Amino acid sequence: MNALIPDIDTLKKVVKINSSLPYESIEPYIEDALDIYIKPYIGKSTISKAHEDKGSDLYNKLLRALGPLTLMLESDELGVMFGDAGITVSNVQGQRSPASDTKIAAAKKNLCFRGMQALDRLISYLEENKKDYPNYVIDNIPRFCFIRNAAEFQDLGMVDIDYSILSYRIMFPTIRQLQEHNIREMITDKVYDILKEALSENTETPKQQVLIDYIIRYLANKTAELYTSQKTTEQHVAGRTIEYTPTIRPIYQDPVSYTHL
């Protein structure tokens, strides 16, 4: 039994589900949803703290993310059976018919949207209450980056992401890659180290701040270009059909090919 969602009634608080569904059909996917979608962004310590107080805001916000993501993860397997005859489904006349592929896809998309939006709100809550969750801070100490948070990505980088911390976290590896590869090619190692030290210690001079602002603007817009490029997106999600898409207002469009005209 999972301590966060110990029964179907708990799950029903955040998703629409039939009470007759055996809890054993859902249980394996709860831990998977935690490990895949939630733990990387809030850490094991924060999840353990939610276990301790089921009446806390932390638990309620975590449940609103975990419920939809659990149901999304198991929806493809729910209703099918694995046995000697292979993969089969129940075929009982007079009972409810299986939903069409279109409806299943639409339901999964909505569950993903709800779960990820709830996860974004959960992360925002933790960021706003860091003093109450010191282990969350320890578990999420990032490596040095010129863009330190979602607000800087939007305000200084001039790319609209709805101030989404989750969007920023999703794009963080790409930002770092561009920083370590492109920025280091644009400026000398000495200048890079000086800017890094100044930014880390909040001792930037006005001239240094101008250069840092330009770097942030480049990193934000180049990252957004990569994430909104149709070709990049097609390559990125080829092996994963369910993936959170960062909130970015379109700023880039692949050139249109007219060869087929």
What label would you give each PLM region?
Residues L11-I47:
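N-terminal ordered "arm"
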Residues I26-L34, I165-T203:
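Hydrophobic/aromatic interaction determinants used to assemble and anchor large protein complexes
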Residues T259-H260:
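Conserved small/polar residues in nucleotide/adenosyl-binding loops
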